[in-house]
A protein has these predicted regions:
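Polar/acidic, low-complexity leader/linker segments enriched in S/T/G and N/D
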Residues: 1-46
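Short, charge-rich amphipathic segments
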Residues: 2-9, 24-29, 78, 87-94, ...
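Short amphipathic beta-strand and strand-loop transition segments with alternating hydrophobic
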Residues: 42-46, 62-64, 135-144
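Oligomerization/assembly interface segments of phage tail-like spikes and tubes
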Residues: 46-48, 53, 57-85, 149-163
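Structured, beta-strand-rich domain cores
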Residues: 62-137
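Mixed-charge, glycine-accented linear interaction segment located at domain edges/termini
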Residues: 138-221
Length: 221
């Protein structure tokens, strides 16, 4: 046995950045269409909710506590968005270059990447985040006059999710993959699936399909 140590060299980890966003629009059958790159992504803010405590009392003392179901939400911020996002934001094209709002909002999946660094290297690895079964709420758009300190409009959308099944676990709508703990071949297989290749489209697999892909790849010698 050894005494605990803190802040050893190479063990001061942190996470930063948001990049490589991918949108996976959901079609009328509930399946995801091919992924499209999301340029201009500036932030993704995770905002889980729920898991609220219900206290139970018996014999004049606290007997137990129950927790409500947990929900996963997130906010996307960006300078722009792909055309495929418009139906997810409640817009419809009615003529060339003409769109209308207040339409049915299309579901979607979304993935993005954050960077892991430490005190030795500011890019030790990456984490791939995936959200399934999402819908976006209407958001404010603020337009202002151009002045001597111009700035681009930042769009923002609050997104909610409905969980999907995961074999052997409770349903979930979010997965986080720490690439630094996986073989390079496994990371490439995940990226090829989510981002596509020269011969295959970018697709969004289910949680079970991703888990199988990872476990099969990690099990190979």
């Amino acid at each position: 046995m050894s005494r605990l140590t803190w802040d050893a060299v190479g063990e001061k980890f942190y996470e930063m950045g948001t990049k490589l966003g991918v949108l996976y629009p959901m079609n009328n059958t509930g399946a995801y269409d091919k992924g499209v790159a999301w340029n201009g992504l500036t932030a993704v803010t995770e905002s889980p909710s729920g898991a609220e405590e219900t206290k139970l009392y018996a014999d004049d003392i606290k007997y137990a506590s129950l927790r409500s179901a947990e929900e996963y939400g997130y906010t996307i911020e960006a300078y722009t968005y792909p055309t495929e996002w418009e139906p997810c934001d409640g817009s419809a094209q009615v003529a060339t270059g003409v769109s209308i709002g207040q339409q049915k909002r299309q579901g979607f999946g979304f993935s993005w990447v954050t960077t892991v660094g430490n005190d030795v290297d500011d890019e030790v690895g990456q984490k791939i985040h995936i959200a399934w079964n999402s819908t976006a709420s209407p958001s404010e758009k603020s337009y202002a006059t151009i002045n001597d300190n111009p700035d681009a409009i930042t769009f923002s959308w609050e997104c909610t999710t409905s969980p999907v099944s995961v074999t052997g676990h409770r349903p979930t709508s979010h997965m986080e993959i720490d690439c630094s703990k996986l073989k390079p071949a496994t990371v490439k297989a995940i990226q090829d699936k989510l981002w596509g290749t020269e011969t295959a489209e970018a697709t969004l697999p289910s949680p079970d399909e991703l888990i199988k892909l990872i476990t099969d790849s990690e099990g190979q010698v």
